[in-house]
């Protein structure tokens, strides 16, 4: 019967107020809700009560929303249908209406519904006997319906009785369509009886819920008689289903409806994946007509979507009413989504009663072990919400279709206890309920009181049931959030790494393009050499990348472990002995950590080291040990790998060095800023700075909390006494005096070190500041590369004296033999891709080397004589009777390793052309005074002279004017007063350390000479360059590709081109190795002209100087009466007098 006041197909807006106003109306015209439960006849039989218990056995698997009770008048419920957007609309039969019976043949139509009734059990009337089945047909139909009920739990009305199953076969279709539609029963309402043979239009909805689990009522007699023989076959078929369906937690299991057979089975495939929540309604809903049901079923045929039920959403807050047009549009949009939802594994299994339904329940539970079903929590508080929330819930459900929400497996014992409690309470309520109207009024009043309570409150029963479930769900949500946040961080890291890789690839492509352009200009030989260099570069880059990755991984692992350790410590509930405590930094040497350092060791050792640069290998399987406290001198020819190896040690690259060892490598000058040299040096000692800061912290803690040592948060693995001892050991109170002495020893004045800013110094002086910082820190390993290059003679002598007292590991790369003789006690000689170590200073090394060379020459001669005899025997007897012996000796000759002597390097040649002789004097200074304009006079009344046989060394502290005097000699500057007499035929050549930087590096040496000297013949240029070691293919190479020493040779060759009578050499040894310096000394001694030398290289001065001219600060020059070594000893005495005592 249609609703009053509403035409067919018409929809009305609904609201909570209208529903409340409609209570107490006539029951006959009441419209169906979206989820209308099947009425059940009220009886006193206990078998129906068992069915009710079965519906509560699985409350976590299928939530059931319950609608508010109201006394609706006839025709008023249709207005509410327009706002309800519920996907599931079960259809009841009219109360008291007799459906038209449909005949059924024996063994006939039940075959059509076999596949559709896989999982739907049939309820039995409470207190009544099960309906008998017709012969030949009804037995099989009942089995098919049982198959479909294995995954569809069916709730039972609260306080109501299960609906009976009428005779006849028309019930089959309704059961088929209840596969996925749980049907609740109204609380306390009277069930409407079903007539025999009545049609059920609800079959479409039931067919669409093919995979929702249905609990089965226990104890029905009819269940025992149902087809037991087919159970095993049905179980095998049901195990093949693999579609996961999420189910709300806390919802009560739906109850299958009963009714006659309908004709609409086409919607089974369409709604195979749709899960439909069902409301519980009052008993007035039972009177709704079947015509409106048919209209709603036609709308539901379009639904093909899995509708997950949101966790924690209200299941009972949907109001009664039919569907509106907007619901249909949303359903059409949702049909496109086909996302599988996770279903909870392992639902609660209870002991099943005997009978067919018990077997069906057992089969459905077996299949649940493969399907994880999230279950929704709920309570009575959910009943308040109305149809306005339906749209929000559907949107949330659509979002949840993209997210699988696994739920933990519930324990059987916990669920059993909670379900038994709930069933016992329900059974008590059902006994108290009667058939009269006063029962309905009492139930309505109870429901209204529950609606007035705040939503935050739930009934005690739900609290008891869901307490542990809620805790589990909160833990699960936190666990799900944690991996998401971690994955987001990993994604960010991966994204940043990917960007860096793309940038590197772009840079490589740009480099390749540039190289291709350069290759077009290069010859074949140069291209091949460049390709070899590229290969080596690629290998090195790969090694660097791998090293960076390893370092990053180690740092990340260390930081994570450290953070984890800090997070895990609960300082409030932990014993202080269990706290790891804070350690001092590795560069701080406290007594508390000396034991650990002694176990680790302070030596540096490496084996089988391979060192290479683009284009060639420097070291191959080299081994070396640097013992702590020893001082090593590193010698070898330029470009052989000395500086490269020192940098490798400083970077700890492929070389094992204990972490507590501080390694300092003085390579670059300090950056100029507003700090003074003294402050810059004091700030370099990190250990002293940390000790002073920690002393302040601990003394402050002592004042605030005298018992801080017992606070786990403040625990330290060292004491304040340890800090005091270390500060005393390093003379922290005398740090300023020590820093000042170092600066003064390196050439600074006491007045300027605390006033002048570092930015006001030149590069050479800032390099001295960097050296002073390293010496002040006193690292365990000090690495120096050509420390005397930027120092004057006085500073070199001071540095020698300072390093003589060095008690830690020292490795010095130096080309000054005198410095090595004074400082080191071991020599490491690099040659032929290997390292040889010698005990003693540089002179001892040279003696041992010469002895080894003579011994090797003798062995070489002996081997050559032996090989010559063997070769003569082979040649003589290869064709006679001793041919076999000759062949045997030939094989022996091939196995003999020939001894090879070190070849003399052709570049170790400096040959100045000899000038014609000129009568003296060539250059004479007579009462010469000089000073720059606006400055004080630098030189006063100079009376000096230079001839062709002069070999003079100018010495003095930096800044006294040695280079200025040399410019006056060359004529670059002119005297202020006095007179400089020069011979007219005299030619003078001056070498400056800055000339190397002024070379045109885009030219080859041959092109440079052609531009300087009016295009002389190429062969003449090559011959002249060969006299200074620029031979073979070097004259054809660009100057930019030459080493610093080779560039210096080009300058010397340029000076010698004019065949000068006097050579003025200002620091010519920079960039020259020891062998080249020796060659330069030999060339200068063989030169027949005059030589004036300015050099910090004591060995060169000692080899060539016949006169020592000392330039003093007062602008005078005097001839030192002794030798250079006598002058050096005098400098040493002066340095001792310069030391600040306090």
From Swiss-Prot:
Gene3D superfamilies: P-loop containing nucleotide triphosphate hydrolases. Residues 1-564 are annotated as: Disordered. It comes from the Eukaryota. Residues 203-212, 233-244, 295-306, 329-340, 392-404, 441-451, 471-480, 501-518 have a biased composition (Acidic residues). Pfam families: ABC_tran, ABC_tran_Xtn. PROSITE patterns: ABC_TRANSPORTER_1 (PS00211), ABC_TRANSPORTER_2 (PS50893). Residues 604-857, 923-1139 form the ABC transporter domain. The gene is abcF4. The lineage of its organism: Eukaryota, Amoebozoa, Evosea, Eumycetozoa, Dictyostelia. Residues 314-328 have a biased composition (Basic and acidic residues). This is ABC transporter F family member 4. Signal peptide: none annotated.
